[in-house]
Amino acid sequence: MESVLLSARCTANTATVFWNKPENATADTVYEVSLDGGHSVHTNRTHYTFTELIPNTEYCVTVYSIGSIHICTLPARRRIYVTEEPYNAVGDGKTLNTAALQQAFTDCGPNDEVYFPAGIYLTGALDLHSCMSVCLEKDAVLQGSSDPTDYLPRIWSRFEGTEQECYRSLLNAGQLDHTAGANCENILLYGKGTISGGGHVLAERMIDIERENLREYLAQNAALVATCENDRTIPGRVRGRLINLSNCSRIRITGLTLQNGAAWNVHMIYCDDIVTDHCTLRSGGIWNGDGWDPDSSTNCTLFATEFETEDDSVAIKSGKNPEGNAINRPTKHICVFDCHSNGGHGICIGSEMSGGVADVQIWDCDIAASSNGIEIKGTPKRGGYVRNVTVRDCTFPRLLIHSVPYNDDGIPAPEQPYFEDFHFERLHLTGQKQEHGTVESVA
């Protein structure tokens, strides 16, 4: 792992420390944690959050048998209330607030935070920028509209492994550039509120518009369409996500409910150092409704998160043949731990993995309420590799490592993909897959 054994992320009043599970640890291992050498707390999880801290203050956190880390809470920030002058956003769930909210986001400096009090704030696409913070209070909902025109103009993005123009997502950060590093950094999205997309209605409207735009192309390429999952696959690739991070670094999303993107909920493309923790991700009834998707990204960490998704709760990707082979940006150093599913397909690597996937660590997850559990997949055309995957102390319905027939258009890579160096330890495989409220035995 490139990431250090012990890490921390802070707000003004909290510090969350998290660490890699030691090789000799088991599901019963208990860790002792202290702040500035004071009273110790004990936890059987590989993370702990200290609360009621003083802003802009240095502390030392010790996890005995792991190590110590010096941290500094964030300074208290000036709050930009979206409901006050000059923004006057209306949280009635009916008034479209896009212009007002975008102005608040634009005005947010490094020492500010955009603050949403309780209410339902209807909006179209919004753009984030470096060094900003957004706080959603309990019962505050940032609600994406179901009108595709509210997500124009389109932006350059990547969906199912191919770069193309897509509708903007509800929240957008960074500009896509597979030749470069980060162009947007240091963003904090936090609170106890909800970020909710336009969901199924928005998705279907986007697909219908694009199907009409591509009518002649689809008619002339019937053989290509026949290789797709269905006739909505190609037009469906223009959908935005709930949160789209392109070429971003040092982003944290914590405490929020994230739900109902038009496709995937959180999508990281060409990113580094992304932390998502203590969130709830939902996407019931949404086609391709993934939860958390690192895509040609590095050092991404997900923990203490609940899932109820229509598709993969987690999907680790790195592009699709032939473009993914040419761009050749692997996804690596991914940690997923202490996560729980209440529906969905489970934790997946692939099938878009043409740029390669390496060093994935998964531990202490209960994904029993899913259809697939842990799944590593590709197609013979993909090329690339998946290697160095470690999964420990988890519950799944089953473990799948296989080739799949869908999303298989595109020119084949010169070689088939390589799957190698997988380590599985102390897994509880229930043999009972769960999908849409039904339970079925698996072989």
Locate the predicted segments by residue:
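Extracellular/periplasmic carbohydrate-active domains that bind, remodel
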Residues: 1-443
